[in-house]
UniProtKB/Swiss-Prot annotation:
Homodimer. It catalyses: XMP + L-glutamine + ATP + H2O = GMP + L-glutamate + AMP + diphosphate + 2 H(+). Residues 203-395 form the GMPS ATP-PPase domain. It comes from Cupriavidus taiwanensis (strain DSM 17343 / BCRC 17206 / CCUG 44338 / CIP 107171 / LMG 19424 / R1). One of its GO terms (molecular function) is ATP binding. The gene is guaA. This is GMP synthase [glutamine-hydrolyzing]. Keywords: ATP-binding, Glutamine amidotransferase, GMP biosynthesis, Ligase, Nucleotide-binding, Purine biosynthesis. Pathway: Purine metabolism; GMP biosynthesis; GMP from XMP (L-Gln route): step 1/1. Residues 4-202 form the Glutamine amidotransferase type-1 domain.
Length: 539
């Protein structure tokens, strides 16, 4: 049985990052709403509890409180931002509204050599004080310590930026250790989880495979399972895991909507039929999808049409498999949290996935989601352990609607063909171009990244078709052809992203090859927008 951390979510946009940092320490954790019952907290039996941040005000909103069981269990508790404030209020301290709100980078002084912060510092002042570079995001602040607590940290704007009751192993910080902007944040969370809470770092994928396989066999028995295979990481890993558990009881349906990447259908069939010997039904529905997309320019309408048509095609194939009793999906933990699947009232539905919808209810099937407890990086690790090739497991993310949302405006087959070829050239050049010492000296990459491909050094890269024409010259003739934009970003969590500073020589090769090899395109531009203000995808 694994040690578990319970994360109570008060509505922060970055609660998932807390869970990711805990999982990176190889400790299992789950996110649940702050208003779970005392009985739930006791039955969960956590080794420790973490209270998240929130957009709410402790001073004004008396409803967002941690269950009493949090304080009765006798386990270590870490409060983060709002979590610190509710800890203070519930344990007899004082919180006040501040006329000096603090958002962004801050330098914080550690006090008292607490177990949480001892020997963790970014630099020292001339007076010898240990300082930390942290990320603040709060309006209210603690102005009075609860009984038994001592000061742990402070900033000029926030005299009580951290507090601790080391007898009860209660710690609280006003900053966000889970975000990358807090330089030593990961180290702090690891210390809380591994040393203060005493969790064993035994959450590893090899063990998880055995547990997941056993659970799938127990759930499914001798019944059959159908899975929509997209070629993306999540559905591919789910298919490989389920196939390992039940073999030919699984049938995969691969729908080609005409908006896939270059040779994607071929690669999927080679992998799952050729190497894993799985049963795969390949449906070419490109005419159906493209026909319904004709004349549609609104991005959200395009997504809805693609989602609707996918459901229709998948339903038609599923009904042919009369023995199927289960629908498998590659749902991962962020999907569960974002869709409110953790039953938290605080979670806002951010997106709906085009291949989920109401399929299980419509088809009368039971739902099998073997990846629903895993983050994306854990899914990739699982895929490698299952024997999937790294080039498939570590492919950049690809949207469910495919090229349909990378073609601005109306989707046409000719546009998709042009974009597919341009995108393939861009990805090929990224894969074969290796970062050099010159790149590191120019500040384009870190010294330790020298020798890696630029594909591996970017988090997501793709081409976008722009439905505008520009004048060009090729040979002795004038051209009037379409424009393609290249987009490459670097990010740790996809919540924020920087545009990738690719070498000019690499961009030049991409431009030359695209213009010379893809007839119909005569201009290539590079997107230098970060997120925010832009999103990663254009639509």
């Amino acid at each position: 049985m694994h040690d578990k951390i319970l994360i109570l979510d008060f509505g922060s946009q970055v609660t998932q990052l807390i869970a990711r940092r805990v999982r990176e320490a190889h400790v299992y954790c789950e996110i649940h709403p702050n208003d779970v019952s005392d009985a739930f907290v006791r039955e969960f039996a956590p080794k420790a509890i973490i209270l998240s941040g929130s957009h709410a005000s402790t001073y004004e909103d008396h409803q967002l409180r941690a269950p009493q069981a949090v304080w009765d269990l006798g386990v270590p508790v870490l409060g983060i931002c709002y979590g610190m404030q509710t800890m203070a209020v519930q344990l007899g301290g004082k919180v006040e509204w501040s006329d000096h709100r603090e958002f962004g980078y801050a330098e914080m002084r550690a006090h008292g050599h607490t177990e949480l912060l001892k020997d963790i510092e970014d630099f020292r002042t001339p007076e010898g004080h240990g300082m930390l570079k942290v990320w603040m995001s709060h309006g209210d602040k603690v102005t009075g310590l609860p009984p038994g607590f001592k000061l742990m940290a402070s900033t000029p704007s926030c005299p009580i930026a951290g507090m601790a009751d080391e007898t009860r192993h209660y710690y609280a910080v006003q900053f966000h250790p889970e975000v990358t902007h807090t330089v030593k944040g990961r180290q702090m969370l690891e210390r809380f989880v591994l040393q203060i809470a005493g969790c064993k770092p035994d959450w590893v994928m090899r063990d998880h495979i055995e547990e997941a396989v056993a659970k799938i066999r127990e759930q499914v028995g001798d019944e059959e399972v159908i899975l929509g295979l997209s070629g993306g990481v999540d559905s591919s890993v789910a298919a490989a895991l389920i196939h390992r558990a039940i073999g030919d009881q699984l049938t995969c349906v691969f729908v080609d909507h005409g908006l896939l990447r270059q040779d994607e259908g071929k690669l999927v069939m080679e992998m799952f039929v050729g190497r894993l010997h799985a049963k795969v039904v390949h449906v070419d529905a490109s005419e159906q999808f493209l026909g319904h997309l004709a004349g549609v320019t609104d991005p959200e309408q395009k997504r809805k049409i693609i989602g609707r048509e996918f459901v229709e095609v998948f339903q038609a194939e599923a009904r042919k498999l009369t023995n199927a009793k289960w629908l498998a999906q590659g749902t991962i933990y962020p999907d569960v949290v974002e869709s409110g699947g953790t039953k938290t009232k605080k979670a806002t539905t951010i997106k709906s996935h085009h291949n989920v919808g109401g399929l299980p209810e419509t088809l009368g099937l039971k739902l099998l989601e073997p990846l629903r407890d895993l983050f994306k990086d854990e899914v990739r690790e699982l895929g490698v352990e299952l024997g999937l090739p790294p080039e498939m497991v570590y492919r950049h993310p690809f949207p469910g609607p495919g090229l349909g949302v990378r073609i601005l405006g109306e989707v046409k087959r000719d546009y998709a063909d042009l974009l597919r070829r341009a995108d393939a050239i861009f990805i090929e050049e990224l894969r074969k171009t290796i970062a050099t010492e010159h790149d590191a000296a120019a500040g384009l990459c870190e010294p330790e990244q020298v020798g890696k491909s630029w594909y591996d050094l970017t988090s997501q890269a793709f081409a976008v078709f722009l439905p505008v024409k520009s004048v060009g010259v090729m040979g002795d003739g004038r051209t009037y052809d379409y424009v393609v934009a290249l987009r490459a970003v670097q990010t740790t969590d996809f919540m924020t992203a920087h545009w990738a500073h690719l070498p000019y020589a690499l961009l030049g090769r991409c431009s030359n090859r695209i213009i010379n090899e893809v007839r119909g395109l005569n201009r290539v531009v590079y997107d230098v927008s970060g997120k925010p203000p832009a999103t990663i995808e254009w639509e």
